[in-house]
Amino acid sequence: ALAINLANGNTGSITLTENITDFDFTNVPTNGVSTFTLQITQHASSSKTVAINQITVNGGGHVTAKTAGGGGYTVSTGANAIDLVTFLFLDAGTPLINALQDFS
């Protein structure tokens, strides 16, 4: 699991060394809109995966993030490819995801 505490800021980065099967967000404000942008850098030699269907917000149950058109999110697979993924929360609800992908 990738633990993300919004009390520590609203940006972060990770280089994939293993598959990410779930995200655990804490300290997401319960009133209004908040965001977290994550820079994901793909592994240099063997592609890893990122799942958005096992997300917890402030200790709640697992939810699947919503994406434009319901198409989901697939992390870029090229060696060292960079994705910028923004999670948008409204009142600490199910996150909406926007991704800019495959920077190289």
Language-model segments: which ranges?
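Extracellular beta-solenoid/beta-roll
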Residues: 1-8
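Short carbohydrate-recognition loop motifs
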Residues: 8-14
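Acidic, glycine/polar-enriched metal-coordinating patches/loops
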Residues: 15-104
